[in-house]
Amino acid sequence: LVGSEMCIRDRGMYQTKGGISGALEKLDPSENYRGTALEGLDAFSRQLKRFDIKVKGRNSDCVEKFFQSSNSAALFPEYVSRAVMQGMERADILPNLVATVTDIEGMDYRSIASVPSEDDKSLKLVGEGAKIPQTEVKTRENLVKLHKRGRMLVASYEALRFQRLDLFTVTLNQIGAYIARAQLKDAIDVLVNGDGNENPAGTLNVATGGKVTYEDLLKLWTELAPYELNTILASTPEMQKILSLSQLQDSNAGLDFQATGRMITPLGASLLHTPELESGKIIGLDKNCALEMVQAGGVVTDYDKLIDRQLERAAVTCTAGFSKIFTEASKVMSC
């Protein structure tokens, strides 16, 4: 692990692409450990074992274990980033909405768009030697709006000294969950109102105001064609109305829900409870072609000390935005 020791002394490695994990992997490749007791661990996890830092379980160490040396202290921001990312993944329903994720290194990104007419969608027969019809792909007029979300962690030396890493990880997980919900709210706003390129979602109304019927869901399904209705987002009141439908209350559905927690879904679509969605709205979309997520790096952690007040500080941030791919791949139903 000599190469890894040299790497973690340089905290500037956090600023490189891939962060300290990527830098450690280059100097200490995991493939070198095949067939050994350390197989299955990445370079960062091997560094934790090297410094005997236990981050989970009943015998987890206190946070101060990271600061027993300058080398081990350089691992602390990566531990924070991973714990926050773990919380984001647990609370994240964006994979059910996003067709693709684009990683960028700057702050300016312009997506592409193809807006085929009904004639373009027909894909007419092409005779021998005839010209093949074209579908234009253009860059969007406006840039994707990126939003920076984050939180500053501030703790006294005393709190860190006696805080178990297992419990501290739970706190970081919750911060990750907050970031995931904020990003979900951004995604919903783009689905409903568009990404600034004059592409808001088409709207339709339920047959009876304040009430959701199975016929309304069928209407949403037909209005979305030729796209596939595979995801439905519902606010809390609308979620209750949908689950109260007689079509979703047969005995088999009830037994499955009690046994596994899985709800029967209308028309085979994933039904997602979305408190971030405005009350009185239901969104139906084709997750395979509705939304693009753009992120500038992953979770970024910056760490420093305030000596005069004996405080440790860690700033955790994540920058991301959303762009519509095909406008007609999402519809909003007003209830």
Question: What do the PLM-derived regions correspond to, one by one?
Answer:
Residues 63-149:
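Assembly/oligomerization interface modules of large self-assembling protein complexes
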Residues 1-7:
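Short, small-residue-biased leader/transition segments that mark boundaries at the very start
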Residues 246-335:
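Sequence/fold signature of self-assembling virion shell proteins
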Residues 9-101, 306-307, 311:
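N-terminal catalytic cores of peptidoglycan-degrading enzymes
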Residues 195-263:
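Extended, solvent-exposed, turn-rich assembly/linker loops in the middle of proteins
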